[in-house]
């Protein structure tokens, strides 16, 4: 048994009927032409043989009586793979758009807390001897880095326990839960002086710094109202696109930018197009960009990240200026978070009362209007650098996306995988007519950036990826 951290628990409390807090991982897998018999039962056997490597798949959420403390993970519960791993069939021959639509349907329902907080869907019907595995994992269980590490373990790209047998442990009693909660409360009280000291040290660094705080961080409650900011519907829609990583790296190098800057700039250009289309005007936006502070390859669970607020120059019609301003704003936001301390929010999250936090997030999710903190979430996660396998089958593509937050109907998540930069977009049912408007806008903006920089507008074709939708 282990206690959810305050930050893990906040991600649990923020889930409501219309704000689902699961993340999605999509792996496209190419079957050998002589191994077409690989089906959902064979896949269940593969996962069963690796459960000892993928410990979080056995975590069962256990609430503390009277909500006396954050919930706990029972670390080795009974796992019913027939429940967790489910078949799904596309109408053959399915392509990118058909798979995206299936992922949107899968994302539209929350996870059942009576079971470990994950599901996998074995999707058949893709063209070219391919299948897909869609993993739905609660954010309280793992952040982007932990999910990438767990996926790498599952594909044998990272070492885990070589020999092992999955053995369930007994469920705790109410007395054990209350006793552990009381002891942990005493420990948390003992950590308050260190948390206050961490906070005052951060504020002291801010006072002494010549750069101070970024404008986005000092005015965090003023994002403009837009088409994407409203009360969410429970429905989810999903879209993907792929760029060649070599093209993005070359463009970034020429412009003195990072891959993360390029992701922000492409997102800004696409959002500008959509703002003009849906709102008739384009104003600067405020994006929350997660920043991890624990990149340990051994970590496969938990949340060790903070969110920095980055202003996006969606009002600018100059693609190169958008890259430059995104770079400057990202640098400023990173410096601000380093000054304050990257663990500031997560440390104080330990003291959020469970019942009060759940009530607050229910109220926020039902409000009809803009999010008062941000317009959208944008993530860029470095994924595996080597091609993975599931059994003997080759993983050709990986896509990932995080959840939507209250009042924000758009999430853009980018994962790199070997030679690919894979874009994923999640929306609710009322933000855009088609989420592929966002992915198409990002590709179009990348082409405009390259054109303005004097680079070829002919993009490298990623042969291993599905054709664009």
From Swiss-Prot:
Output the Gene Ontology cellular-component terms: plasma membrane
Q: Which domain of life is it from?
A: Bacteria
Which keywords label this protein?
Acyltransferase, Glycerol metabolism, Lipid biosynthesis, Lipid metabolism, Transferase
Q: What induces it?
A: Induced in response to low levels of nitric oxide (NO).
Pathway(s) served:
Glycerolipid metabolism; triacylglycerol biosynthesis
Q: Does the keyword Iron apply?
A: no
Q: Name one GO molecular function term.
A: O-acyltransferase activity
Which GO biological process categories is it annotated with?
biological process involved in interaction with host; glycerol metabolic process; response to hypoxia; response to nitric oxide; triglyceride biosynthetic process
| Family annotation (SUPFAM superfamilies) | CoA-dependent acyltransferases (SSF52777)
Q: Where is the active site?
A: 139 (proton acceptor)
Reaction equations catalysed: an acyl-CoA + a 1,2-diacyl-sn-glycerol = a triacyl-sn-glycerol + CoA; di-(9Z)-octadecenoylglycerol + (9Z)-octadecenoyl-CoA = 1,2,3-tri-(9Z-octadecenoyl)-glycerol + CoA
EC code: 2.3.1.20
Tell me which family the UniProt entry assigns to this protein: Belongs to the long-chain O-acyltransferase family.
- PANTHER family for the chain: O-ACYLTRANSFERASE (WSD1-LIKE) FAMILY PROTEIN, WAX ESTER SYNTHASE_DIACYLGLYCEROL ACYLTRANSFERASE 4-RELATED
This chain's function reads:
Catalyzes the terminal and only committed step in triacylglycerol synthesis by using diacylglycerol and fatty acyl CoA as substrates. Required for storage lipid synthesis. Upon expression in E.coli functions weakly as a triacylglycerol synthase, making triacylglycerol (TG) from diolein and long-chain fatty acyl-CoA. Has very weak wax synthase activity, incorporating palmityl alcohol into wax esters in the presence of palmitoyl-CoA.
Q: What is this protein called?
A: Putative diacyglycerol O-acyltransferase Rv0221
Origin species, per record, is Mycobacterium tuberculosis (strain ATCC 25618 / H37Rv)
